[in-house]
Regions:
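Bacterial N-terminal signal peptides
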Residues: 10-17
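Generic N-terminal leader/processing signal
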Residues: 1-2, 16, 27
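Bacterial N-terminal signal peptides that target proteins for export
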Residues: 1-9
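Mature extracytoplasmic or otherwise solvent-exposed domains
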Residues: 24-172
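N-terminal signal peptide c-region/cleavage motif recognized by signal peptidases
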Residues: 19-21
């Protein structure tokens, strides 16, 4: 009797353990990733998606170039450079005609903050607001989620180097 119970329990546990990687999307792969400016834009290709709907999320952080502006329109440089964060999402439909054999291109872009509170920006007083003119990106993370279950299928982190004209990000 105990042998049967242990056998059934073992089969049940093996079924759960074997099914977990399948539902977690362990076969999803990211390739050909390149980054460019606009905000921070990541383009690439995902494979191993099957026909599942997925969301591609980019989370990034960096140091802003800040100009303090008062209500009269006067401008002075900000005296502080706190790290700021931005993110963006792209939905990839499993029935999209661009998806072939479980493979899909993507292009996801951050939605950047435009302003920062005066005291964080190093502006002279509360009559000023910090306007973010540009962000020197330092870090980025691309995550892929199953749209129906929100399960994380893939995550890749990058170190970024930014100039006023270009950005280069390499996997950590």
């Amino acid at each position: 009797m105990n042998k049967k119970l242990y056998s059934l329990l073992s089969v049940f546990l093996m079924t759960i353990v074997m099914a977990a990687p399948v539902s977690a999307g362990g076969a999803v792969k990211l390739s050909g990733v390149s980054f460019r400016l606009g905000s921070l834009i990541a383009d690439g290709t995902l494979s191993g998606l099957g026909n599942a709907d997925v969301s591609v999320v980019i989370d990034a952080s960096g140091i802003p170039a800040i100009t303090c502006v008062n209500f009269g329109g006067n401008e002075v440089p900000g005296q502080s450079y706190p790290k700021v964060a931005a993110s963006g999402t792209q939905f990839l439909d499993g029935d999209s005609p661009v998806r072939k054999n479980g493979k899909s291109p993507f292009g996801v872009e951050t939605v950047d903050p435009e302003t920062i509170p005066w005291d964080e920006a190093g502006c002279p007083s509360s009559n000023w607001i910090g306007h973010i003119a540009f962000i020197f990106w330092e870090d980025a993370t691309i995550s892929v989620y199953d749209a129906s279950t929100q399960a994380l299928l893939l995550q890749r982190e990058y170190d970024c180097k930014t100039t006023l004209t270009s950005v280069s990000c390499t996997p950590k």
